[in-house]
Curated annotation (Swiss-Prot):
The modification Phosphoserine is found at S87. Pathway: Protein modification; protein ubiquitination. This is Tripartite motif-containing protein 5. The gene is TRIM5. It comes from Macaca mulatta. A zinc finger (RING-type) spans 15-60. Degraded in a proteasome-independent fashion in the absence of viral infection but in a proteasome-dependent fashion following exposure to restriction sensitive virus. Residues 137-225 form a coiled coil. Can form homodimers and homotrimers. In addition to lower-order dimerization, also exhibits a higher-order multimerization and both low- and high-order multimerizations are essential for its restriction activity. Interacts with MAP3K7/TAK1, TAB2 and TAB3. Interacts with HSPA8/HSC70, PSMC2, PSMC4, PSMC5 and PSMD7. Interacts with SQSTM1. Interacts (via B30.2/SPRY domain) with HSPA1A/B. Interacts with TRIM6 and TRIM34. Interacts with BECN1; GABARAP. Interacts with ULK1 (phosphorylated form), GABARAPL1, GABARAPL2, MAP1LC3A and MAP1LC3C. The modification N-acetylalanine is found at A2. A zinc finger (B box-type) spans 92-133. Residues 283-497 form the B30.2/SPRY domain.
Length: 497
């Protein structure tokens, strides 16, 4: 019953023009009330089409603007009704129109709202396409179900994107932390090099000081002895001159001859302008070298060795280590997969290739040569039978035969093998290399497109040992290791070592 009374009250305070609860209600002298905006718009419309005649939109009774009065009583009722409409009890009545109290049976397609029949007739929905809810519910249920599936798919994509960005974030964090570690390590190496250079230079200066001062001290002693001899001789002559005639003449010719033949011994001196001038290390060159090695190590590949039927090498089971053996020994070495017997009338060869061929790109690997007195390493364009007969005599280790290698012999002689002259095409030009610190580990970097092969002394802070330029890579090349006749093995280092 209370709801019915409430609906009746709402009808009394509903604007006849907009069918909404009155807003700033104004009343005419005929008793009808309207929203201020609605009656003002109606007044303007009447002035435009009816030659200034103003009439009530409900009863058509004429009125004058001065007769319009604000209706505060109705405004208070509307305010109370709005509070009642927003109460929890009213809000729970979802099947009735909040404005008109009628059942919500229609769906407005343009506004996508559920409305009552009074809403359909209002100015807000006038001319819109409306349908019974039962007519469109199934259609929109299918559309919503499709939208839900689409949304779930997009949610999965969003979750994957979220996971991907988190993974990328973590990857970048790891990479930058790794780069920070490398930068710190590189500069620590630079500091070690500078400390070593300083210590070495100070030792050289101390040695120079010791040698010079020792020589000058010896010269000083000789000069003191010479001066003392002069004093004694002068004293003897003064004594003769002051003594008797006998003293004067006794042995006088010998003394005069001794004085005339006397030559002053001059001390050994050292010219300061001929000294070795100290020059600070080329820090820019060092940084460039470190950057080159750091860049090369980004292309570290996991190289393993490939057996062949022409090498007298022993390859370990993990295919990372190779050593030479006496060609007369014919048994299987423990822990090895491959051994090769001596071949009649065939020179003793211990070279082996890596399994991985290089046809493009950049490739880097490191070889442990510690405690070896002889070795050869680098890259090779593949074994050629006609080039193997004199290989152990170094006659074919030339770039023109597909070998870009450096080597060690007799424990201290480092060399690079270059092409021989036209007069001796089978004899390589062996160039000695200046290596201050003997490498226990050598890095090899191949840039196929740039046609270069570089060798780094990892033991000595990665200093460049030698670099081949303008290499003629006309076919695939392979890592090449040759332990020679030194039985100590050569070992390919893993990228994680």
């Amino acid at each position: 019953m209370a709801s019915g009374i409430l609906l009746n009250v709402k009808e009394e305070v509903t604007c006849p023009i907009c069918l909404e609860l009155l807003t700033e209600p104004l009343s005419l002298h005929c008793g009808h009330s309207f929203c201020q905006a609605c009656i003002t718009a109606n007044h303007k419309k009447s002035m435009l089409y009816k030659e200034g005649e103003r009439s009530c939109p409900v009863c058509r009774i004429s009125y004058q603007p001065e007769n319009i009065q604000p209706n505060r009583h109705v405004a208070n009722i509307v305010e109370k009704l709005r509070e009642v409409k927003l109460s929890p009890e009213e809000g729970q009545k979802v099947d009735h129109c909040a404005r008109h109290g009628e059942k919500l049976l229609l769906f407005c397609q343009e506004d996508s709202k559920v409305i009552c029949w009074l809403c359909e007739r209002s100015q807000e929905h006038r001319g819109h396409h409306t349908f019974l809810m039962e007519e469109v519910a199934q259609e929109y249920h299918v559309k919503l179900q499709t939208a839900l599936e689409m949304l779930r798919q997009k949610q999965q994509e969003a979750e994957k994107l979220e996971a991907d960005i988190r993974e990328e974030k973590a990857s970048w964090k790891i990479q930058i932390d790794y780069d920070k570690t490398n930068v710190s390590a590189d500069f620590e190496q630079l500091r070690e090099i500078l400390d070593w250079e300083e210590s070495n230079e100070l030792q050289n200066l101390e040695k120079e000081e010791e040698d010079i001062l020792k020589s000058l001290t010896k010269s000083e002693t000789e000069m003191v002895q010479q001066t003392q001899y002069m004093r004694e001789l002068i004293s003897e002559l003064e004594h003769r001159l002051q003594g008797s005639m006998m003293d004067l003449l006794q042995g006088v010719d010998g003394i005069i001859k001794r004085i005339e033949n006397m030559t002053l011994k001059k001390p050994k001196t050292f010219h300061k302008n001929q000294r070795r001038v100290f020059r600070a290390p080329d820090l820019k060159g060092m940084l460039d070298m470190f950057r080159e090695l750091t860049d090369a190590r980004r292309y570290w590949v996991d190289v393993t060795l490939a057996p062949n039927n022409i090498s007298h090498a022993v390859i370990a089971e993990d295919k990372r280590q190779v050593s030479s053996r006496n060609p007369q020994i014919m048994y299987q070495a423990p822990g090895t997969l491959f051994t090769f017997p001596s071949l009649t009338n065939f020179n003793y060869c211990t070279g082996v290739l890596g399994s991985q061929s290089i046809t493009s790109g950049k490739h880097y690997w490191e070889v442990d040569v510690s405690k070896k007195s002889a070795w050869i390493l680098g890259v090779c364009a593949g074994f050629q039978s006609d080039a193997m007969y004199n290989i152990e005599q170094n006659e074919n280790y030339q770039p023109k035969y597909g070998y870009w290698v450096i080597g060690l012999q007799e424990g201290v002689k480092y060399s690079v093998f270059q092409d021989g002259s036209s007069h001796t095409p089978f004899a390589p030009f062996i160039v000695p290399l200046s290596v201050i610190i003997c490498p226990d580990r050598v890095g090899v970097f191949v840039d196929y497109e740039a046609c270069t092969v570089s060798f780094f002394n990892i033991t000595n802070h990665g200093f460049l040992i030698y670099k081949f330029s303008q290499c003629s890579f006309s076919k695939p090349v392979f890592p090449y290791l040759n332990p020679r006749k030194c039985t100590v093995p050569m070992t390919l280092c893993s990228p994680s070592s």
